[in-house]
Amino acid sequence: MRFRRVLLGHLLVTATIAAAFAWEFGSGVRAIPSHVLVVGEWDLALLAVLSAVTAVAARLGVRLPGQTYRYLLAATCTLQAYLYTLNVVSHVSWDRNMTAHLVMAFAPTVWSGREPFPVGPIGIVAFGGGTCLVIAAVFSRWGRPIDRAAGSWLGRSRLVRAAALAVASVVLFAATLRVGIGGRDSLYWKQELVSSFFRPEGFAFEPSARRHAVAAHDAVLRATYPAAVPGSHDKHVVLIIVDSLRADHMQVYGYERPTTPFLSSLVDSGRMNKVRDAFSTCSESFCGITSTLSSREFQDISAETFQLQDVLRRKGYQAWFLLSGNHRAWNGLPRFYHAVDGALFDGSQSERYTMDDDRLVLEGLERVPPASPGHPAFFYVHLMSTHYLGVQFDESHVFTRSDDRVSPGLEPYTILERLNKPDRYDDKVLQADGMIRQVFTQLQAKHYLDDAVVVVTGDHGEGLGERHWAHGWHLYNEDIRIPLLLYDAPPARYPDLTFGTHVDIAPTLLDRLGLPIPDSWEGQSLLRPSTRRFTQHQTYFIPHRFAVLYRDREALFKFIATPRYGNEELFDLRKDPREEHNLVSEQPALASLLRQHVSEGP
């Protein structure tokens, strides 16, 4: 066997796997040659370094084992198998390449078994060890021709030439990898598996001319927004976002089970208002959170967006971010928050709880000093109770048995069904309501609620088996119909609470404070009546699936389109809240009108 055949065979397998990723996950064919280039340069660097080591050993009278290159190639293939497997998991789960940052962030939690995951420690060890043994067995059985081919090539190595080649090949590989790591915006590199694995924490705003234009306009707004506004109020502002919280499983929205006793008591007493039909702009956390803070559709958001907390800082507010979950691991969210040192506390910093345990928010609140006159504060509180990864407390088994738990590794193919079954979800809605009560209690004890406005909402909904499980892929009501609750001390009057979306939250808060709403914000204040609107919604994992909600007084329609595949659905949400009757063929004029409002993205 000639040695070039060994290398070409390895690269052929690599190219085939890269092509499979491009075909199955839409990662783009341009990433195939980039991936083959990285692996090929690694093979050459490995061979060149081994040649240099062989030449040095020969000078010293030492002979390396003839199977050395076979072992190194087997190790390379094993690492590739691990990388490909991690990326299959990540693409199936959240349609993104796996990164070392994510592995380091979530490995301790998964390994500990303290949070549910389809495969527990035993499964991880079994897969890792089994993969290694299988590859070792293959190379042991059919590796002798590789030894002969490598031996004939390595035997001709000369020290000076081998050393120079080793240095050159290592430098070339490092330079290529550096280009790949920095090529986040390149069609050839952004989906390449090796370089994307070593990128620093991700950031999910794809650059576009539209985003650059909005960012440039926001830079002017940031510089010119008034620091002092006559007649404005320095009320404390609290934004509570509960992950994966859908309105139709909340008692306060008419659900038959008592899942929200605290929130219901506030609404019943008149201290809290609710928007009847509220929707998230997106069915995934990243775009839901960023749209809420920036009052923008996702396609208009960038790291430089002028956001709610930026406006409030101009007014002298201290901004606090108390966040269940590991926000540092997901798409560079802290960069978007513009949080100053010490003001952001998330699951990666807790000393008492795992990263998806909402009790860590109370731990973070302990760090917040009591309110003082003339020092208004903004709080963004994120709770994970209703997310399928959110920790369920032992005392939170009301609609399920206390022994009805999900053990890692037991049922890998039904893990989402078991985590998301309605009884368990209702338990966790009740738990979230209890956590909100505790947040209110702590804020009240520190006098932040003496003069405050509080918003309680969800970042998106959650599929519970109606059509699918979990979130991120669809735009039906179970995916994007969320609560939107407003608590005011003293009370405020809202003339129209029939309809609202994420993008309305920030304008409403500024209007409540008597502050001007930036002209680039896309939402509407709920303090001002509105009868006719078109609102944009989209998925994050499937970037070309959109929805338009059309509200005209009491009428409410939803148009869902995936233009790339020609799929369209139209629903009358007043008559058909379960979205079972597609009206596209029955109401072509309305479908045509809403089709014109479908956004194709940046």
Segments the model singles out, each with a brief description of its role:
Residues 462-466, 511-569, 573:
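C-terminal cap/loop subdomain of S1 sulfatases and analogous C-terminal strand-loop tails that border
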Residues 275, 281-294, 412-415, 440, ...:
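Substrate-binding rim/cap in mid-to-C-terminal beta-strand-loop elements of soluble/periplasmic
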Residues 243, 292, 312, 365, ...:
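Generic structural signal for small/hydrophobic residues in well-ordered secondary structure
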Residues 168-240, 244-408, 513, 526:
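Active-site-proximal alpha/beta segments of enzymes that process anionic O-linked groups
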Residues 258, 444-491, 535-541:
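Histidine-centered active-site microenvironments of extracellular/periplasmic hydrolases
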Residues 1-190:
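Transmembrane and membrane-interface helices of multi-pass
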Residues 197-199, 204, 219-228, 362-370, ...:
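A long, amphipathic alpha-helix that forms part
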Residues 109-111, 237-238, 484-485, 509, ...:
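A short aromatic-rich beta-strand->coil structural motif
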